[in-house]
C-alpha cells in the first residue's frame, strides 16, 4: 500500500459525496446529466459539463480504488480492476481485451501511451461510417486540450536494451520510430501501470477529471 498522499481519501474525509462507496445511495437523485462510465470518455465529458454549470452524476459499474489500494499485485488487481478479471476476449477468442472496471475505467489500468488517432484510422471512419467531420485539422484543438489537461509529454527515461534494439532495427528498415508520449507527472518507472499507479503519477481520469 502506498504511503504517499491519496487525494481521494483526503476528499472523502472532507465530505465528498461518493454515493454507494461507503453507504447506500438515496432513493432519488436529481441531475441535469447522467454520465455512464468514468473512463476516458465519461471522465472528460463529465468535467466539461460540470464546468459549464450543469449538475452531473457519474455512474460506474466497478469499485472506487485509489493509490492507497494499489499494491502492485496482479492477483488482486486483475479481479478487482478489470472486466472479467482481465480475461475478456473478442467473440472469436483471438484477442484479449484489457478493459478497466473501476473508477477511471481503463485509464486507471492502462500503460499511459497517449497518441492521437492516426490519420489512416480517421480516413477509415470517414469512408466506412460517414464521419466526415473527423479530420486531423478539425480534431487538432481537441487533442491539444486533452494533452494539456492530462500532461501528455515525451517519456524522458532512455529505452532499455530490447527497446533500443527495436529502435535501431526500425531505423535500418527505414521505419520511423520515437519514444511514446505518456500522460504522467513525476513517474517513478515502477513498471506496474497495469495494476493502478501507487504514486499518483499517472494522470488518469481517477486523478484528473473525476475528482
Predicted regions and their residues:
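Extreme N-terminal leader/targeting segments of oxidoreductases
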Residues: 1-33, 51, 91
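Short glycine- and Lys/Arg-enriched binding-loop motifs that mark or flank ligand-binding interfaces
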Residues: 33-38, 58, 96, 100-101, ...
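Redox-cofactor-proximal catalytic regions of oxidoreductases
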Residues: 76-155
